[in-house]
Design a protein with these regions (language model features):
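Intrinsically disordered, low-complexity polar/charged tails and linkers
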Residues: 1-161, 167-169, 175-199
Length: 199
C-alpha cells in the first residue's frame, strides 16, 4: 500500500502520527476527607512503604492494575503509574477498599481528579530541531541542546507541553483527557507541515 504524501509507512500499513499515541502515565488525586495515621497504615497494609525522612507520604502499590498510590497524613491521595483513566479509577478503588479493610473510614467513592496525562507518539521522521525552534517562534520554545536533547514546546490549546526529539519521537505532558494528546499531535503535525519541516 502506498501512503499519502506526509504519511509514514510501516510495512504494508500507513501509520498516522496520532495512531502511534500511547499513554505512559496518568496521575490523579483524591482524598478521604480526614487524616490518616501513616505509621499504623504502614503496619497494616501489605507492601506499604513509609520512610518520612525520605518522603512525607506512604507509598502503596496495587498490582492489578499496576499503580502506586501516595497517601499523605492529611488524607490526600495521589495515584501514579496508571496507563489509562480506567486504571486510575480501578487502582484507587483498590486503595479505598484496602483502607476500609484495615478500619480506615472511606465513605462512598471519593471524587477523583485527573491531574496529568503523559503520552508518547512518533512522527516517523527525523526532525531538525534548530529549524523547528526558529519556525515555531522562540516565545513558546525552550531548546538548549547542551542541556537537554529535546525541544520543549508549550501549547496554549490544548494546554500541554510537548517534548520533540530529533528522532521524531515526542512526549505530550499536562493533558487532562486523552484527547489532549491527540489534539496536540495533530497540531504539531499541521504546524510542522505548514513550515515544510515535516512531509
Amino acid at each position: 500500500m502506498v501512503g499519502r504524501k506526509g504519511d509514514a509507512t510501516v510495512g504494508d500499513a500507513t501509520v498516522e502520527p496520532r495512531d502511534t499515541i500511547e499513554i505512559v502515565n496518568v496521575v490523579a488525586s483524591t482524598g478521604i476527607g480526614h487524616e490518616i495515621n501513616l505509621k499504623q497504615a504502614t503496619l497494616a497494609l501489605e507492601g506499604a512503604d513509609y520512610d518520612p525522612k525520605r518522603f512525607p507520604g506512604l507509598v502503596y502499590r496495587t498490582k492489578n492494575p499496576k499503580t502506586a498510590a501516595l497517601l499523605f497524613r492529611s488524607g490526600k491521595i495521589v495515584c501514579t503509574g496508571a496507563k489509562s483513566i480506567d486504571d486510575v479509577y480501578r487502582g484507587l478503588e483498590n486503595v479505598f477498599q484496602s483502607l476500609r479493610n484495615i478500619g480506615i473510614d472511606v465513605k462512598g467513592t471519593p471524587e477523583i481528579k485527573v491531574q496529568n496525562i503523559v503520552a508518547s507518539a512518533d512522527l516517523h521522521a527525523v526532525l531538525n530541531l534548530n529549524a523547528i525552534a526558529i519556525g515555531l517562534g522562540l516565545e513558546n520554545i525552550e531548546y538548549e541542546p547542551e542541556q537537554f536533547p529535546g525541544l520543549v514546546y508549550r501549547l496554549s490549546e490544548p494546554k500541554v507541553v510537548v517534548l520533540l526529539f530529533g528522532s521524531g519521537k515526542l512526549v505530550v505532558t499536562g493533558g487532562r483527557v486523552p484527547e489532549d494528546a491527540a489534539n496536540a499531535v495533530d497540531r504539531i503535525v499541521k504546524e510542522l507541515k505548514s513550515l515544510s519541516l515535516l512531509r
